[in-house]
């Protein structure tokens, strides 16, 4: 352990050769989801955001099938509606009484047009949610129903939209017509919350509606569930300082202070958050110091990164997720 108040002249040159990017590091939350697990990054990120939870024995059970009621609850969480939707509510389905644990989630998702029943008045809350049903619910949540309906409807149009916009990226061994497991659902949700949402942008007097995908292109703003519903800000930049080192070779160390990183922010993905803005000259004037929290953000010193931060109860921003920026990193050399 370092107990020095100042570290000077630990002089060594480090050449960081980046051959693989898209790495997110956290302390493992579940005994059955290790770094070698296919859905490790997705499960860990969603756990940090409070979207998925594990079991009392410390496991996540990624191979266990998700039910339709559980999927309705997850849909509420990725929209930030957990508190309002979890209360018991009346539903239109004969097999989902107000006393059912997920009645509030089911009622809300049905009211939003995200979920449907079987056509006989039932919902089948304890039935396994099929892969294509889960994809449909997610893409409808993102606003892509008009796109899907113009490209084959259910399920073809929704599956096509999910593939085209990257929601199914990293999903393996998922088969339509079969129940989706917790690992697959985690990957879909992790992709979805960082996917540009689609929404109505223009209404005409003749009743026609124009839709926009808010992907930051063609003068459109950049909007995702993370930015609009979960209060998570996406940034890019270079980490220039950690709690123990910086790129100048000297660093004051305070053992009583929580670990932080300092970032030279180069992009804010058009966030509307006032704490992360550039001035009229293009100079960044926003927050640039973030709590490391449970991430391994300090391991990225000197690297170009994409990071996600969120304000905590103490009004400080902490790192939720971090990854090397594959479009920027090649070889970075610095001296400590």
Region locations from a protein language model:
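Mature N-terminal segment immediately following signal peptide/propeptide cleavage
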Residues: 44-52
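Basic amphipathic alpha-helical segments that dock to polyanions
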Residues: 46, 109, 162, 301-302
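Short, flexible surface segments
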Residues: 68, 182, 301-302
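Short nucleic-acid-contacting surface segments enriched for D/E, G, S/T with interspersed K/R
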Residues: 289-307
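Alpha-solenoid helical-repeat scaffolds
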Residues: 327-336
């Amino acid at each position: 352990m370092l107990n020095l108040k100042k570290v000077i002249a630990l002089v060594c040159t480090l050449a960081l050769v980046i051959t693989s990017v898209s790495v997110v590091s956290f302390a493992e939350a579940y005994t059955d989801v290790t770094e070698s697990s296919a859905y490790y990054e997705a499960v860990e990120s969603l756990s940090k955001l409070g979207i998925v939870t594990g079991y009392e024995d410390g496991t996540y059970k990624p191979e266990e099938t998700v039910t339709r009621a559980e999927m309705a609850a997850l849909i509420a969480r990725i929209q930030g509606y957990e508190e309002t939707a979890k209360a018991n509510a009346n539903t239109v389905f004969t097999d989902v009484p107000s006393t059912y644990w997920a009645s509030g989630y089911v009622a809300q998702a049905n009211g939003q047009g995200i979920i449907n029943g079987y056509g006989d008045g039932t919902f089948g809350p304890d039935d396994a949610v099929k892969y294509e049903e889960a994809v449909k619910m997610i893409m409808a949540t993102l606003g892509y129903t008009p796109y899907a309906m113009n490209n084959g409807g259910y399920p073809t149009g929704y599956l096509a939209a999910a593939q085209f916009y990257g929601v199914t990226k990293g999903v393996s061994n998922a088969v339509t017509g079969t129940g989706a497991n917790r690992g697959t659902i985690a990957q879909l949700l992790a992709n979805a919350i960082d996917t540009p949402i689609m929404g109505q942008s223009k209404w005409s007097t003749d009743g026609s509606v124009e839709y926009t995908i808010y992907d930051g292109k063609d003068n459109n703003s950049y909007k995702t569930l993370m930015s609009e519903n979960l209060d998570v800000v996406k940034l890019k930049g270079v980490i220039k300082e950690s709690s123990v080192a910086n790129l100048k070779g000297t660093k004051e160390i305070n053992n009583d202070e929580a670990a932080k990183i300092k970032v030279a922010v180069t992009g804010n993905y058009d966030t509307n958050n006032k704490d992360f803005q550039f001035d009229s000259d293009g100079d960044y004037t926003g927050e640039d110091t973030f709590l490391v929290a449970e991430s391994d953000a300090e391991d990225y010193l000197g690297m170009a990164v994409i990071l996600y931060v969120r304000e905590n109860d103490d009004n400080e921003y902490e790192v939720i997720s971090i990854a090397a920026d594959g479009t920027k990193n090649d070889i970075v050399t610095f001296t400590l």
